[in-house]
Amino acid sequence: MPLDPSSILLTDRVAVVTGGGSGIGRGIARGFAAFGAKVAIWERHADTAAAAAEEVGGLGLHTDVRDAAEVDAALEWTVAELGPVSILVNNAGGVFNSPLLETSENGWDALYRSNLKHVILCTQRVARVMVERGIGGSIISVTSIEGVRAAPGYAAYAAAKAGVINYTKTAALELAPYGIRVNALAPDITLTEGIMEVAPEGAGERFGFTVPMGRPGHVDEMAGAAIFLASGLSSYITGQTIHVDGGTQAASGWYHHPETGVYSLGPT
């Protein structure tokens, strides 16, 4: 069948972006709105939810997506205000250092709830609406490069992100008969407000040494991949994790030597 340029558009489709008040989530929400979607932002910080919703002309809901009751309430409100949801982006997440020998049970649970539990809750609830309405749709989860490589000091976070990747594959198979596609995005270094707040001076240049494309990513580049996965142009893609990382995952430890610029592997 011939390609139709309008297939990239999301006109009048209802999209939910969790954790859409800042960073990658806000970039995706902004991108969806630019391509015609009606966007609902589910965000546990009320002020950023409101600000992001105003920017994209959408609906901002103060929601803790780790809580099933709040997810149910947010979904009911979204459907009532905007209509049935056909796009979901599970973007909410969090990370802190958690060395294996020092991680408490509470710490492990916190990282699980922040990075995996909400993916299960939101995917299940939104998919039920899609199935009941017979509308199909696209579900996209934001995982991380840490989901496919070792992450010393971040075992709990990496395990949760790996769980997102496998859950994506399994959910894709279970939901395929209903016309629901399930995919994931795996960023690496992406310039967000949070990264810029904690990064030392000159970090941008150092980040560039580890990325084959020579620079960190931008939230709008994550949004571009999300728009593609949400749109009709990706109608035969499901169960996949796309690494939007400038080539870092493919590099497998190769990096630009800071003095010569030549690719090197490990210490030199």
Where are these regions (language model features)?
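Substrate-binding pocket helix/loop in short-chain dehydrogenase/reductase
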Residues: 99-100, 107-112, 207
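Alpha-helical segment proximal to the catalytic Tyr-Lys
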Residues: 128, 173-177, 235
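Active-site helix of classical SDR
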Residues: 123, 160, 168
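Residue(s) in the substrate-gating loop at a strand-loop-helix junction
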Residues: 144
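Active-site loop immediately N-terminal to the catalytic Tyr-X3-Lys motif
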Residues: 101, 149-155, 177, 214, ...
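C-terminal helical subdomain
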Residues: 105, 184, 205-237, 244-246, ...
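Conserved glycine-rich cofactor-binding loop
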Residues: 14, 21-23
